[in-house]
Amino acid sequence: VSDMRTEEEQVEALKNWWKENGKSLVLTLALALAVIFGWKAWQNNQRITAENAGTMYQNLVQAVQLASAPQATDDQRTTAAHLAKSLKDEYGDTAYARFGALFSARLYVDKGDYEAALNELDWVLAQSEDSVMKTVATMRKARVMAAMGDADKAITLLDGLKEPSFSVSVAELKGDLYLAAGAVDKARAAYQSAAADAPQGARPLLNLKLDSLAAKGS
């Protein structure tokens, strides 16, 4: 451009450049705008989805509280079950749905439908990548399996848990399952392991369980 001597030459050069590059420039800008607005639309959709899932989850929490009460009606139990299913069906890729499935499993346990409870817990385990969520679901699955009379498999299931923040809870649960299965010595060892690592506030209950074993002369 510096070699050009007149404005007309500069204008003509710009025209020629535009003819050669204008269409690709417009296309590039259009694509860039589409990406920007598409990203914003996606973010907005994600926000709305999270808000709706959160609202449904809060409704589920309230419904489960009512459905779990001793005086709960069949309608209240049905409402809670419907909300849990809707949360999973409509927002299955959210954490709210996984928490909802945990509630659903609890409702099935209350009804004595252990197979359905296991299905809900297995769904949580399949959907979640979070180690804490997986640990919670696995511990609940172990309880359900023990209630079905399969304590040995339940304990084996617990052996695979490695989440450090749940080590005390897992050891205590093992003690409960061993005790229910009549393996008193193993129950005592599990309780002692839990008590050794437990925070101060959790020790009284563990000590009570150990004292109970001692009182039985075991």
Predicted feature residues:
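Short solvent-exposed coil/turn linkers within tandem alpha-helical repeat scaffolds
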Residues: 88-97, 125-134, 161-169, 196-204
